[in-house]
Amino acid sequence: LPANRTFGNSYWLAEELTAVTKELFTTFKYGYYSPVSLGFTSNTWSTIWNGIHQCYMFQESLKQVSNEYVTDEMKKQYLAESNFLIAYYHFLSMRSYGPTMIIRSVIDLETPISGFPERSSIDEVVAFINEKLDEAMSEGGLPTTWSGKDYGRATRLAALAWKSRVYLYACLLYTSP
């Protein structure tokens, strides 16, 4: 019997006898929570920072592309979408952990911990998120709407809506009793 679920491969659940012994949701229930077994927190943390890193890596790679398949218009769109995602991931970090680090570029894998940015204030995080959303909207790469196969991609209206959500979360921090 499998001890852990493999995301995207749930065929084993069709078996008559299936026992799931250590799922993330049982972390507290069975006392598995420890510094080495963080459950949901660990997964959220790594997903956020991997997403930010990949966005900056993509932006670096995009600067080096020069061929007929990737037009300047497409580059502008991709840059705007990656800035939108950088803002989105920083917002997820702020929502999950409060004031957090602001990552402004690719961090080399050999960087010692002392070389990482320190935790920023909530005001700095909110300002950075809104700065990235403004960059995404000002570059002209985000259209107002998408249709067809592009439906669901980042738009100018989504960036404005996300900006309002960022201000809402920041406002709640200051106005809560």
Roles of regions detected by a PLM:
Residues 174-177:
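Conserved small/polar residues in nucleotide/adenosyl-binding loops
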Residues 94-106:
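Short, well-structured active-site flanking segments
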Residues 109-110:
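Flexible, solvent-exposed coil segments and beta strand-coil junctions
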Residues 1-14, 57, 123:
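Acidic, glycine-rich segments characteristic of secretory precursors and extracytoplasmic regions
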Residues 21-97, 113-127, 132-151:
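Conserved, well-structured interaction surfaces
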Residues 152-162:
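Amphipathic alpha-helical protein-interaction segments enriched in hydrophobic
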Residues 12, 17-19, 23:
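Primarily recognizes Gram-negative and organellar outer-membrane beta-barrels
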